[in-house]
Amino acid sequence: MINSKMRTPEGDIYEVFARFREPNLHHIGSVVATDDDLAKMYAAKLYDEWGWREMTVVKRAAIITVIAPV
């Protein structure tokens, strides 16, 4: 069974973070990919509207929740 919050039938969900001029990364969206290399390529192509200084992707399944809504 696929956990729809972490995966889709097309692949894993990756969260995309980037920064332009500010010192901290900001969440800018998400992509779906079958592996890390595709996730990087999809993020770079999909979110190319700025000249980002830094961009990173992380599998949603790798995010550890500290405080969650009840």
Predicted regions and their residues:
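Short acidic, gly/pro-rich beta-turn/loop elements at beta-sheet edges
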Residues: 26, 41, 65-67
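A short, charged, amphipathic alpha-helix used as a generic interaction element across diverse proteins
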Residues: 34-52
